[in-house]
Amino acid sequence: MPLHELGPLVRRIEDAGYDSVWSAESTDFDGFTPLVVAAEHSERLRLVTGIVNVYTRGPALLAQTAAAMANVSNGRFVLGLGASSNVIVERWNGIPFERPLAKVTETVDYLRAVLAGDRGAGGFKLASPPAEPVPIVLAALRDRMLRLAARIADGAFTNFLPLSNVAQVVHTFDMPGKELACRFFSIPGPEDEALATATRTFVAYATVPVYTEFFRWLGHGDEIEPLVDAWNGGDRKRAVELAPEQLVREIFLLGPVEAQRERLAEFADAGITTAVLALSCPPAELPRLIDGFAVRP
């Protein structure tokens, strides 16, 4: 969707009772600019990067951008940070994807200091630090990053989580008072088409090393190893054919909106505090789905 058309949609989201809007950063726009538009067309919504990585922007630039976002949103901005993946960091941007846990830790420590008005490493100091602390949420898939998020961040943001594994993530995070968000891909439409789309998306993610390790950690290694081997061997069609259908159905929201809402309620009951919806549909369908998932339909 063109950014100049985003404003009315943001107003609709706010009027429908949603708590926040989250902006991803992958192959489309950067993670911050859509939130600037959202800030201008909302009064209450939290505006969250979900996520920007700690490699492709230096820490001083991240601090400057976070401060600007806090300013333009009147304190509603939440900085979602993460290590991302070797694909985005190294393959697309030419930056070594090294020491992700240490890099995230160092970046958060730096940002906490600089956003509070102190000097960071190298002597950088913000001329206009935010009036209030900027909350930080960390992208976290496996145990070490989940525990790091529990220790140094205001919340954790996970992804591609099967319902049967929510308890494992909640137990590892072990911070009942902090936000535990999860992104959900909602794919409406005929079930066969939706399942095919979900399967292709699953394979594209599951074959990225950080997600391969994530699914192994969750206990699904035996299910995904054949498709990962096929993908790495160059047979992508076979990889899609080998995708475990039951696992795909556990992760993605398929079918009518009411059925998808019921699935989200199950995740909430299991311990997910914030459901971040990624709606896979033509732009013309967005208003209907926004209303369908609304907190106050």
Regions found by a protein language model. Give the residues of each.
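Active-site-adjacent structural elements that line small-molecule/cofactor binding pockets in enzymes
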Residues: 1-297
